[in-house]
């Protein structure tokens, strides 16, 4: 019997791809000889490659008609048995449909963000799990996987890792904490000034250097963090994906909101202190499979064996995007975050 041929579709973004890895690991472990082709955006090819899960990685520019036509033709010629759309958008569901893939698996209407998308699937899965990574695993189960999710192992590219370690050595930095104040939704962000105060406390009490990670369009954040950090002089990092993976992999701890770098740190094996407000950590929080986070009786901190998630009690979950920190983010006090960092760092020593 010929081996199965799967098309896995997850175009972006960083955190969403990370939360798709456990489901695709389960697929790979269930079908070790299968061909798994992963379709993604060019920006995330390195990330997908780092997982070692895909036989081939195809990329498409979703805003380019020529790129769409090319990828649909390639999918048609490849004669896939099954396409699994882990994203649930028109742009992620359409290629396999237009290419005529026989079995197309995706989420039922209640779990997709765009109305009508499931009409393009032959198999519609009603997700019952709380966390998005486990929901993705339900798609893998429908495709025939023996388990919904499995443990993820990714590593930074060796060339980036070597260069980054030399960068740290040249600056006399050994142990450090990464502060990640940015995010696509400012409503999910903790104020940068509080990150600055946290940086000072980490330096004074734990004798650790801080590295402020920020991305495109976030050039205002580092100055605000530095301006509130007294004379601790945190390092600033605004690098490409490969060096970012190295930065996160070697950190003692990563502090940030519900953003891609935080979830990438978890996949790299680094403990995190995650600051949550409008989004629900039970659905979008740090994910370590069977070691997933559970709520403490106070419901203000969520802890697993490696991570601590802080969220104010009685927050109403919302996915409405805003340009200012959600009020629930302002309820998270610096002292509480520092204590969480101290506990995580102590647990590693």
PLM region spans:
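Catalytic machinery of carbohydrate-active enzymes
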Residues: 1-349
